[in-house]
Amino acid sequence: ISGENLEEVPILAAPACEGYRNKAQYPVARKNGKAYAGFFKEGTHEVVQMDRCRILPEETDRVKSIVIDYVNKYNVPVYDESTHRGLLRHIYVRRGAVSGQILVCLVVNGDGLPKLPALIEALKAVPGFTTLVLSVNTKKGNAVLGDKFVTLYGPGYIEDTLCGLNFRLSARSFYQVNHAQAQRLYETAIAMAGITKKDLVL
């Protein structure tokens, strides 16, 4: 780097290669009359349907499937980026790696969703489901979350523990998506810096 010969350091491999990611954002689309969710095709905004993503916990994909079933059952309008019409834009799911608590955030191009009691009851079947939040995003563009959040069920946040500290996590909170590797990163940095409980770190 910059002409310097740096000492090689060992790579700390992640303890898990599957099921580790604690956050997912699924864009929603409709094709042939049926709603589906997945991820954008590389370099495009074309949504590719995905039933199971192996880097996510099974509960996260289960939430996505429940929401899509609800959308199809009650014919909830799906957002169309080309016309800026429709309602549901994204399904956002966050799961505490330690607590197992799950936050579901639905991003909408409007003020609400129909038949919410039915959706909430269906989500209660998912172990760890804690809260349902609405994010209102009526702007054109690539931003997923909007500026307005409405709590529809539960406290509006989940809790989780990292490096012995407890955190409240909302849909807007920054939190490393690989919990186990983040903890190893912080612990390694503390050890290399020789930080003790008596030190004040700025």
Each language-model region and where it sits:
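Accessory RNA-recognition modules of RNA-modification enzymes
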Residues: 1-202
